[in-house]
Amino acid sequence: MSRNPFLDPTLQEILQVIKPTRADRDTRITVIDQLRDVLQSVECLRGATVQPFGSFVSNLFTRWGDLDISVDLFSGSSILFTGKKQKQTLLGHLLRALRASGLWYKLQFVIHARVPILKVVSGHQRISCDISIDNLDGLLKSRFLFWISEIDGRFRDLVLLVKEWAKAHNINDSKTGTFNSYSLSLLVIFHFQTCVPAILPPLRVIYPKSAVDDLTGVRKTAEESIAQVTAANIARFKSERAKSVNRSSLSELLVSFFAKFSDINVKAQEFGVCPFTGRWETISSNTTWLPKTYSLFVEDPFEQPVNAARSVSRRNLDRIAQVFQITSRRLVSECNRNSIIGILTGQHIQESLYRTISLPSQHHANGMHNVRNLHGQARPQNQQMQQNWSQSYNTPNPPHWPPLTQSRPQQNWTQNNPRNLQGQPPVQGQTWPVITQTQTQQKSPYKSGNRPLKNTSAGSSQNQGHIGKPSGHMNGVNSARPAYTNGVNSARPPSKIPSQGGQIWRPRHEQ
């Protein structure tokens, strides 16, 4: 395989644009706080907690990534089953409260989905949110992806690049019969498992069974047990991996990723992708996969035998394989920086990068780039698993800048309410960061969202994350047009768009 000398430095340029800034993180935390305020106005949801999950929690989101939010009804108590009908009813109440507040628009109730979801967009920040009820499974999977990303820093970079590439080629939308973002992350995990030498182990080495099955009994106890087992197994793998380290560059891993799945439409007829075992598995020999037929089977390692790629259609699978083939071939042959950008990114990224003059010092003849940790582990601020966030809920650190101490995944995930935390002794080890009101920002003195308008300059942090996007567009959707649900215009934007009020919590500087 010939090596493109400009690929590595160009990938770093792309990552610099798509990786979220601190302002992007703060903006999402502000949206979470605003949703908490609305939640308190819904009588049947008082006492429930707002818990983010998905790419924001796994630290695999881009600057314009959506927010996945779970409204947890039984935080910290026994794990109880919430029926689909009850979830639909509660989301209906929340929908009416969000509409009445005037701070949210493009409201859409996906009532008959496998997991009922309320889709909304925050009025000021223009962040899309998918809200569900008691999505403990999604939260658990997000934490596992975060733990995996801490094993090797190249994992996060490759996931971000693959997601941007997939969006650019219209193959990252489960609603249209292509990949969802979670299945793309699993493909990257599988790629890292099947490299030589392997970068990641089979996920059964990290957790020996379907983790979702262990979410029973007292939630705190169950989650702490999962975290402790995972921490010990990751530590063991990292110590053993030191004997054989894969030093492939990010560009080599990306090119081999596209090459590995370039015939996925052919392999999918006989084999399934199994990150749990870390190898291609014959579908006919796996009885748990047989009852249903899918165009592509990517087993969810944390909820077996669920197919994470069940949305991929046969017709689209052939097109997906063709996109893999073309991308693999062009990345090996193309030497032009702009053509690489055109292959891997969408228009809004291209417009930003094409305006950037590439300095000769950035693109050496040997293709190297002055970027630290190209082959190594996670970035310094992410080298260790997170501190005991739920025990120190007013700590100034945000979720993805953990201090350089401790090395275990979290314990005690479920202390979501600051009232339940005061006076508790510190717990050894670490817990998952629970974003609470006191962590994020102080309560705004303005009630009911009636905050004063404030002019926002084009270069302010509030506009970050919308690079190169025309006004009226958000995440590729024309937000200037109202959306209609069941014949009713539910997308009427507020006549006044409030600015962010109150004192916004800011993280301390990185070490």
Curated annotation (Swiss-Prot):
Presence of the UniProt keyword Coiled coil in the record: no
Any one GO cellular component localisation term in the record: nucleus
Region (Disordered): 378-511
Enzyme Commission code: 2.7.7.52
UniProt subcellular location: Cytoplasm; Cytoplasm, P-body; Nucleus
Enzyme class: transferase
Regions of compositional bias (Low complexity) in chain numbering: 381-392
GO molecular function: nucleotidyltransferase activity; RNA uridylyltransferase activity
Family annotation (CDD domains): NT_PAP_TUTase
Keywords associated with the record: Cytoplasm, Nucleus, Transferase
Activity regulation (UniProt): Completely inhibited by 2'-O-methylation on the substrate RNA.
GO biological process: miRNA catabolic process
Catalysed reaction equations from the record: RNA(n) + UTP = RNA(n)-3'-uridine ribonucleotide + diphosphate
Biological role stated in the UniProt entry: Uridylates small RNAs to trigger their degradation. Catalyzes the uridylation of 5' fragments produced by AGO1-mediated cleavage of miRNA target RNAs. Acts synergistically with URT1 in unmethylated miRNA uridylation, leading to their degradation. URT1 and HESO1 prefer substrates with different 3' end nucleotides and act cooperatively to tail different forms of the same miRNAs. URT1 and HESO1 act sequentially, with URT1 mono-uridylating the miRNAs followed by their further uridylation by HESO1. URT1 and HESO1 are involved in the uridylation and clearance of RISC-generated 5' mRNA fragments.
Family named by the database record: Belongs to the DNA polymerase type-B-like family.
Name used for this protein in its record: Protein HESO1
Source organism: Arabidopsis thaliana (Mouse-ear cress)
